[in-house]
Structures are given as structure tokens and as C-alpha cells.
Amino acid sequence: RPSFCNLPVKPGPCSGFFSAFYYSQKTNKCHSFTYSGCRGNGNRFRTIEECRRTCVG
């Protein structure tokens, strides 16, 4: 899996509310979170399918 999958979830400090998904190394699963729209990182996906395809297994 790409190294960015291991980055911590980072919602960011802005005021937007965007549904996103991140990979958790601890659970080896993708989970939903609310992204603020800025200053996130590479461990952020638009769909759970994209997250799973990139980071799980």
C-alpha cells in the first residue's frame, strides 16, 4: 500500500463539511470522516471504494 495510507486522518481547520474516507492502519479498514476543505493529506478519498482499492489488503 502507498505510504500516504498510513498518515493520520486530518480533517483540516477550514469551515467546509465534505464527506470523505480515510484508511486506518489500526483496523485495516476505511472509515468516514468530515473534511473541512483545506489542509488535509493524502489519506483522504472521495469514496470508500477508492479508499479500499488503494489502501486495504
Swiss-Prot record:
Belongs to the venom Kunitz-type family. One of its GO terms (molecular function) is serine-type endopeptidase inhibitor activity. GO terms for cellular component: extracellular space. It holds the Pfam family Kunitz_BPTI. InterPro entries: Kunitz_BPTI, Kunitz_BPTI_sf, Prtase_inh_Kunz-CS, TFPI/VKTCI-like. PANTHER family: BOOPHILIN-H2 (PTHR10083:SF217), KUNITZ-TYPE PROTEASE INHIBITOR-RELATED (PTHR10083). Interacts with vasopressin V2 receptor (V2R/AVPR2), probably in a selective manner. Inhibits vasopressin binding human V2R in the nanomolar range (Ki=3.50 nM), and also potently inhibits vasopressin-induced cAMP production (IC(50)=21 nM). In vivo, intraperitoneal injection of this protein into rats increases diuresis by 6-fold, without any loss of electrolytes. Exploits its two major loops and engages more positions in its interaction with V2R. The pharmacophore defined by numerous amino acids positioned in loop 1 (9 to 18) and loop 2 (34, 39 and 44) may be at the origin of the absolute selectivity of this protein for V2R. The lineage of its organism: Eukaryota, Metazoa, Chordata, Craniata, Vertebrata. Residues 5-55 form the BPTI/Kunitz inhibitor domain. CDD domains: Kunitz_dendrotoxin. It is found in: Secreted. This is Mambaquaretin-5. The keyword Secreted applies. Its main location: secreted. Disulfide bonds join C5-C55, C14-C38, C30-C51. Keywords: Disulfide bond, G-protein coupled receptor impairing toxin, Secreted, Toxin.
